[in-house]
Amino acid sequence: MTDTDTTTTIYTHEEVAQHTTHDDLWVILNGKVYNISNYIDEHPGGEEVILDCAGTDATEAFDDIGHSDEAHEILEKLYIGNLKGAKIVEAKHAQSFSTEEDSGINFPLIAVGVFLAAFGVYYYKTNFA
């Protein structure tokens, strides 16, 4: 482990790989190293999913879940340094439920609505007129 400046510690893959137990657990996320030993018992998904990624780059697994902003805030407190040679990238935050693609009018829903309205008019005219 070496210091590139007074605030950031740089770790190698080998150093991170030595921290794989419940009481001493590190992971790599987006080129950053996190000591999540004190958080593992609080993890909503259970400790098994974290232990499966212990000592490795867990970026893909973390991003696939789509963690909340709160999860990212917790990570900030667990950050201990950067991975040697890694390009630091911003973590992907969970997508909101509404995207540009699905925020428009939903055609099948409109078609059903038009059908029901037409049926209602037909039913009214044949039974009450």
Swiss-Prot record:
GO terms for cellular component: endoplasmic reticulum membrane. The chain crosses the membrane at residues 104-124. InterPro entries: Cyt_B5-like_heme/steroid-bd, Cyt_B5-like_heme/steroid_sf, Cyt_B5_heme-BS, Cytochrome_b5. This is Cytochrome b5. Its main location: endoplasmic reticulum. The lineage of its organism: Eukaryota, Fungi, Dikarya, Ascomycota, Saccharomycotina. It is found in: Endoplasmic reticulum membrane; Microsome membrane. It comes from the Eukaryota. PROSITE patterns: CYTOCHROME_B5_1, CYTOCHROME_B5_2. Belongs to the cytochrome b5 family.
